Amino acid sequence: NLHLQDYIPYKDIPNSLDKMDILLMPYVSSITVAGNVGDITKFTSPLKLFDYLSVGKIIICSDFQVLKEAIKEKENAIIVKNYKNIFSWKKEIHKLKNQPQKQFIMSKNNYQLSQKYSLKERAKKILKVVK
């Protein structure tokens, strides 16, 4: 079943994500912002990814370069190459639905990986650069 959710306060996100089986990250190939500064895709921090990892759930995401720092295809996420095609997403969801062992392994991998990308660990990296 698909559930579309209204705004959720940030503090409630982990609880909401925990109720889901598969988490989607349907990014587009380029991101622009007001002020005509151009494509900021290379500089975007995928905060949603860190939230998803922390609850140890299955992730299906667009083939988006900035995600590949953390995402290893088929190890902790499914990358949809033809992400503009809704049927590609549907196909990946259905494939995962019938592979409980793969779901278990990917979930476990994501939770372990989340420790590397926790707020505390990311803050340590930023402080190293600043000092």
Could you say what each language-model-derived stretch is?
Residues M25-T41:
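Short Ser/Thr-rich beta->loop micro-motif in glycosyltransferases that lines
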